Amino acid sequence: MTKYIFVTGGVVSSIGKGIVAASLGRLLKNRGLKVTIQKFDPYINIDPGTMSPYQHGEVYVTDDGAETDLDLGHYERFIDINLNKYSNVTTGKIYSEVLRKERKGEYLGATVQVIPHITDALKEKIKRAASTTDSDVIITEVGGTVGDIESLPFLEALRQMKTDVGSENVMYIHTTLLPYLKAAGEMKTKPTQHSVKELRGLGIQPNMLVIRTEEPVEQGIKNKLAQFCDVNSEAVIESRDVEHLYQIPLNLQAQSMDQIVCDHLKLNAPQADMTEWSAMVDKVMNLRKTTKIALVGKYVELPDAYLSVVEALKHSGYANDTAIDLKWVNANDVTVDNAADLLGDADGIIVPGGFGQRGTEGKIQAIRYARENDVPMLGICLGMQLTCVEFARHVLNMEGANSFELEPSTKYPIIDIMRDQIDIEDMGGTLRLGLYPCKLKPGSKAAMAYNNQEVVQRRHRHRYEFNNKFRPEFEAAGFVFSGVSPDNRLVEIVELKEKKFFVAAQYHPELQSRPNRPEELYTAFVTAAIKNSN
């Protein structure tokens, strides 16, 4: 029988529910259990695909092409699993499906209501996520804060699950903030008490509290919360701020969180062996070298827009016993005149993805600086496309060369819309999304990065591609197309072989990086940057 764990949040948003859920998932997986995890987002968008990065942070893409919340990146990195489209559910997606069924007459004339139709659809998503992965345990995080109007149907669905599958198969974990008032010199439990009261008013009695805090929590505070919130005192778990996120599973294990969960759900599983994870954390805490990487992006005011990129760089740094000193460079600020001032102290330059015209000329100048000064450079998605544009302009002398997306009237459309995208009008969910194969050119830097594999599978999110009519001119000038689709139609990786490392990929390699198994192209780039710093 599948076990269901529901993680809710109270008092404030952005409290770290996703990290708590992911950490618990890692502990249960290391007990030998098969775990999956999902995120419920109460916003009305179908998915975050068309949302501004300033609003939402990065869009995380799964193998099957779902555009999802960035928390899924935490889930995959912590638990080391590949999730699917059932792992992110929004209000918009649920209402869209219910209304589509209503239009088809599938409700047989019934009045369509939040209860039971919306809640049934939500419960079906929970069960489908578990069944498609054949999991022993599914962890479901509900976005937002208890008390939000948007969350009510989700919480009602969670309440009903206890009746549907039995109380012994369901556990509710509530994550709250325990504020410390410096003037009073004490922690305040009232916000947590009121949050739990709100949750109980909706019919959900939490079985465990995870309290987010900056300071150590005395046992007396835990006992008080246990008494007023009606949970066992040992089930009041402290989640204190840490230097590195990957310490959190170890901190939770030290408080027997996973054992309490297993006892509640009657899961007979051996103790979690966290030896390898602990060794990784110890290594992360004691890195001996540092290298500076300049990230040239258009959304640098909100680092979450590049969360997976940053994590992938860190992972590759761990593999090289090196801390990444990340320099955030706003692409809007980069010009041909100041590129050396902004980028001259960087050991490597990464140009990640994005959409739209703003900042693209600055990215092109950053790429030009890297090429002309032989600074290791990695381009991702739009960064790959602009790498091609930069080469066309400044090596092939194609004045005004550009992407058709950015300048439809350009004489040299180096990047063009994909053929199967021409007639598509909707923006959302219509990109080339998900896992696709890439055939590597033997002897190339890309092939060497991937240990001379013939084909790798990586996740994509794009609508435009390299215009193949320009391939002969590029190749004649030494531009290497080192990765292509198996039918040779789509360019996936480009590089300049004579440079230390000048490689750009159309796909998003960062989405498959793990802290104990870094993505190979990122590792090759970071390794080159470290060598460049010596």
From Swiss-Prot:
Family per record: Belongs to the CTP synthase family.
Activity control, per UniProt: Allosterically activated by GTP, when glutamine is the substrate; GTP has no effect on the reaction when ammonia is the substrate. The allosteric effector GTP functions by stabilizing the protein conformation that binds the tetrahedral intermediate(s) formed during glutamine hydrolysis. Inhibited by the product CTP, via allosteric rather than competitive inhibition.
Source species taxonomy: Bacteria, Bacillati, Bacillota, Bacilli, Lactobacillales
Protein name: CTP synthase
Gene3D superfamilies the record matches: 3.40.50.880, P-loop containing nucleotide triphosphate hydrolases (3.40.50.300)
Miscellaneous comment as given in the Swiss-Prot or TrEMBL entry: CTPSs have evolved a hybrid strategy for distinguishing between UTP and CTP. The overlapping regions of the product feedback inhibitory and substrate sites recognize a common feature in both compounds, the triphosphate moiety. To differentiate isosteric substrate and product pyrimidine rings, an additional pocket far from the expected kinase/ligase catalytic site, specifically recognizes the cytosine and ribose portions of the product inhibitor.
Reactions mediated catalytically: UTP + L-glutamine + ATP + H2O = CTP + L-glutamate + ADP + phosphate + 2 H(+); L-glutamine + H2O = L-glutamate + NH4(+); UTP + NH4(+) + ATP = CTP + ADP + phosphate + 2 H(+)
Binding site for Mg(2+): D71, E141
Function field: Catalyzes the ATP-dependent amination of UTP to CTP with either L-glutamine or ammonia as the source of nitrogen. Regulates intracellular CTP levels through interactions with the four ribonucleotide triphosphates.
Organism: Streptococcus pyogenes serotype M2 (strain MGAS10270)
Gene Ontology molecular functions: ATP binding; CTP synthase activity; glutaminase activity; identical protein binding; metal ion binding
InterPro entries, A to Z: Class_I_gatase-like, CTP_synthase, CTP_synthase_N, GATASE, GATase1_CTP_Synthase, P-loop_NTPase
GN (gene name): pyrG
Residues that hold L-glutamine according to the record: Y54, G354, L382, G383, M384, Q385, E405, R463
